[in-house]
From Swiss-Prot:
This is Gamma-glutamyl phosphate reductase. Catalyzes the NADPH-dependent reduction of L-glutamate 5-phosphate into L-glutamate 5-semialdehyde and phosphate. The product spontaneously undergoes cyclization to form 1-pyrroline-5-carboxylate. GO terms for molecular function: glutamate-5-semialdehyde dehydrogenase activity; NADP binding. GO terms for cellular component: cytoplasm. The gene is proA. Its main location: cytoplasm. It is found in: Cytoplasm. Belongs to the gamma-glutamyl phosphate reductase family. It comes from Bacillus cereus (strain B4264).
């Protein structure tokens, strides 16, 4: 029996045990994991260093290396996320709705775990912690399949989680890692519908598209982040500068960083040159349309591919438009339905933008960088869904549950 199948069978078995665990037992396990991560930080960082060194030898980009990198502060952030998760209400067993029928039947809709969750993701070892802990909180078993680039980090983190779970009432096999990082193991995971209840891909567009295309298991799609900010003609200059710089340069390798700014031509004529200079001072390479190049001749002329690209680096596309409607059309044409923002003092244009733009998260006068489970108050998230069925946006605890109906009677039969 190969690794993927064996772990699928074990996960199905463990899921039946997890559904019986109380909130207190699950929280004790989460607390143990947080403590163990701190206790074994040096070990995790040493294994992460191996991934970084191998990545550099393979010529990985700076943005990929950043996604791969763990630091003491990033591990502390992980544990803080776990502590927030402990404080959140456990949705399992929650009554979503209840009513009584004229025949006396009492019907309740109750939240229950999904069962076994498969998680396939790239580079980021922090996802290993996020996925494991949020699945445990919601009573789900999880099978993790990271990329070869992070294999040492992922193996170390899962080993630490297992050592923590050994001290609790939850089975160690509640969290399992597929150590085979070949394409064959991924392909088998895609098709394990007898053992997986849902598969969640988290990574670049190519990975997500492959999973959606090839999986026979139900997929919760976490889309790529080709995010935009539209600066309307009434936008406050300093606010716009602060938001754009934050949304692009704070951490360009993440999915909620912006990839294109759309400028109203009147605003661009007044402030565009200064904004472009400010971005270039921070190492941003600009690629713009003809109107943007006319304002700053050092800007590279954008191609069709640039509008479609999630750069995940200090590269930013620039589009200049005449109206809010033109901005909305561009965003709906090229956006990935992740996070989109408008900076304006015109409430009518805010209303148009919020009504017409199709995305999981829409912002007025704020950075797109807030599309995140922690920032939304969800605690650790398992991903940001860009699809419309089941759940959309940052996927917190309720996203990893389903419902079942519990009907109580006193002898009723159907006539």
């Amino acid at each position: 029996m190969n690794e993927v199948l064996a772990k699928g069978i074990k996960a199905k078995e463990v899921a039946r045990e997890l559904v019986l665990k109380s909130t207190e037992q699950k929280n004790e396990a989460l607390s143990a994991i947080a403590d163990q991560l701190i206790l074994e930080t040096a070990y995790i960082l040493e294994e992460n260093k191996r991934d970084i060194e191998e990545g550099k030898a393979k010529g990985f980009s700076d943005s990929l290396l950043d996604r791969l990198l763990l630091t003491e502060n990033r591990i502390i952030d992980m544990t803080e996320g776990i502590k927030q998760l402990i404080e959140l209400r456990d949705p399992v067993g929650e009554c979503v709705s209840a009513w009584e029928r004229p025949n006396g039947l009492s019907i309740q809709e109750m939240r229950v775990p999904l069962g076994v969750i498969g998680m396939i993701y790239e580079a980021r070892p922090n996802v290993t912690v996020d996925a494991a802990t949020i699945c445990l909180k919601t009573g789900n078993a999880v099978i993790l399949r990271g990329s070869s680039s992070a294999i040492h980090s992922n193996k170390a983190i899962v080993a630490v989680i297992h050592r923590a779970l050994k001290l609790t009432s939850l089975p160690q096999e509640s969290v399992q890692l597929i150590e085979d990082t070949t394409r064959n193991s991924a392909k088998q995971l895609f098709t394990m519908k007898d053992y997986l209840d849902v598969l969640i891909p988290r990574g670049g567009k190519q990975l997500i598209d492959t999973v959606v295309r090839e999986a026979s298991v139900p997929v919760l799609e976490t889309g790529a982040g080709n995010c935009h900010i539209f600066i309307d003609e009434t936008a406050d200059k300093q606010m716009a500068f602060n938001i754009i710089i934050n949304a692009k340069t704070q951490r360009p390798s993440v999915c909620n960083a912006i990839e294109t700014i759309v400028l109203h031509e009147n605003w661009a004529e007044q402030y565009g040159s200064e904004l472009f200079s400010s971005l270039k001072e921070r190492g941003v390479e600009l690629r713009g349309d003809n109107k943007a190049v006319a304002i700053d001749s050092s800007i590279l002329l954008a191609t069709e591919e640039d509008w479609e690209t999630e750069f995940l680096s200090l590269t930013l596309a620039v589009k200049v438009v005449s109206t809010v409607e033109e901005a909305i059309h561009h965003i709906n044409t090229y956006g990935s339905m992740h996070s989109e923002a408008i900076i304006t003092e015109n409430e009518e244009n805010v209303s148009k933008f919020f009504t017409s733009v199709d995305a999981a998260a829409l912002y007025h006068n704020a950075s797109t960088r807030f599309t995140d489970g922690s920032e939304f108050g969800f605690g650790a998230e398992i991903g940001i869904s860009t699809q419309k069925l089941h759940v959309r946006g940052p996927m917190g605890l309720p996203a990893l549950t389903s419902t079942k109906y519990v009907i109580r009677g006193n002898g009723q039969i159907r006539k």
